[in-house]
Amino acid sequence: MNPYETEIYKVVPIPNKGMGMIAKVKIPVGTRIFAETPLIRTKSDAKEIEEALSTKTKEEQEAFHRLFNAHPDTMGPFLGPFYSNALTIDETKGGMFLLGSRMNHDCSPNVKHTWNPRLDQVTVHAVRDIEAGEEILTTYIDLHKSHTERQKILLEHFGFKCYCSVCSVEERKIRKISDLRRKQLAYYDRTMAKMCIVNPRGALRALRHRIHIAHEELLFGRLDIIALLDAFRLCVIHGDFERASIFAKKGTKAISLYEGTDSEKYLKISKYVENPRSHALAEGVPALPLFLEEDDELSDLEDNLWGCKLEEDVYSDTD
């Protein structure tokens, strides 16, 4: 079996990018495109990489050395390719994936790669429909940064300037709006944990807005899961177990779509759909709805769930 070509994708040369992965057919959102076991896993130690590679087949060694090396002079022939191509396994280790390394970067990626410890593999899921002939693209960096910040990180760490659909926009106003949205997402990253404790109603509004502006930036998958699980935990902490159950259900649906039902996260959260009170954070918490009075203006079920109407995109009129 050729791992570089299946019924749904193939790895081919991409102009100005080296190799890349192209969809051969339309890939619906939620499709697991592939799962891959790491060739090497390490804490970025050159000697460890060299020793691990020596145990691999000649074909695997050659495939490793064909990978792009953004740091040949400073990191050498082993650490350089690893640093330039590895995907995160956990907080301490990265993994070298020969197939995964062929996915190029985009600042609004169409796939989400996730380490699945139960499978001991990285899984790659489509976060939106991918058309036949479209490149399959992941992200190498934290995308909640401005255009200038992203370009600096990509050039310094990965040796290239990004010309994706987000970065190639020339109109000043559109780029400024994108930067403002991503700056707001970064703010939510820093403040949401505290907000969920001290201002739960405001936090629910912010979580809904967080998902909305992420989608405006064509960022799907990761933040959907994070925001829904934050909303679930918020409701548990404050005793709104009816809402907690709904958010647990929404969260498991998002995890199923973007990571798979074999995800540890899915198995962990799904049990709270029927019994949110069994969560450790619910111990000793009295049942108390977050919104004691019905708001006549929130007749829509989603508005009622989040306790607010969906905010307009406040950045679209930015000068």
UniProtKB/Swiss-Prot annotation:
A GO term for molecular function: protein-lysine N-methyltransferase activity
Record's GO cellular component terms: chromatin; cytosol; nucleus
Pfam family, one: SET
Keyword list, A-Z: Chromosome, Cytoplasm, Methyltransferase, Nucleus, Phosphoprotein, S-adenosyl-L-methionine, Transferase
Listed InterPro entries: SET_dom, SET_dom_sf, SET_domain_protein, TPR-like_helical_dom_sf
Catalytic activity: L-lysyl-[histone] + S-adenosyl-L-methionine = N(6)-methyl-L-lysyl-[histone] + S-adenosyl-L-homocysteine + H(+)
Modified residues (Phosphoserine): S316
Protein name: Histone-lysine N-methyltransferase set5
Highest classification ranks of the organism: Eukaryota, Fungi, Dikarya, Ascomycota, Taphrinomycotina
The encoding gene: set5
